[in-house]
Amino acid sequence: VNLHFIALKATKHSDSQIILTAYSRELGRVAFALPAGTGKSAARMRALTMPLSLVECASDPRPGREILPMRQVVQSIPLVELHSDPFKQMIAMFVAEVLAAVLQSGGADEGMYEFLEAAVRILDGADSRQTANFHICFLYNLGRRLGIEPDVSTYTQGSLFDMEDGTWRMTAPLHRRYLGEEASLLAWRLSRMTFANMHRFRFNRMERNAILDGILEYFSIHYVSMRRLHSLDILRSLL
């Protein structure tokens, strides 16, 4: 069976084996066994399966088999800058870590796969202004695909964003998970951000990190905890 997948994370399983977690078009979340070590074939395999690599391979999925073999491994779509530009490398690590947390179970979802593949290609070809906001745009649109997008129809000028309800309201809720007026306006503006216009949104590092914190908290409330992302601190320092 030919599988097309996006590499997410590699974990050392033993001295001779690495487990690659990936998201495939055909099966959804999958795990592959890769050779560890310092040989040419192992090094080539690791290069092909760096975070967010777009890969095609032959495999033999069977009922009850949790870790799949892989052979005839090739890049399905060559990526020019994603693994050579240090900023894009860091964003790729962060996005892959988020996806490994979010895409835990379930079968194939071709719409999700196509969204992810398109996003990876956009990041690979992005200029510096687009790259700076890519992770914010990606997370918002990922939330939309996961069904947790805030109800933007509830926004009115001066309203406050209730993080728990995912709605805007004119009075503060009884809990503390809500945004002030200025941040609530910004949360509404994010709903208008697309990969095509993300370069037009101007934020400094402090603003960008505050937005990122807010989105990750929203994911933690509505989907899965984002409080243990190892790549987050490095990402904050770069963008």
Name each model feature, range by range.
Residues 1-239:
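Non-catalytic alpha-helical scaffolds and adjoining flexible linkers that form interface surfaces
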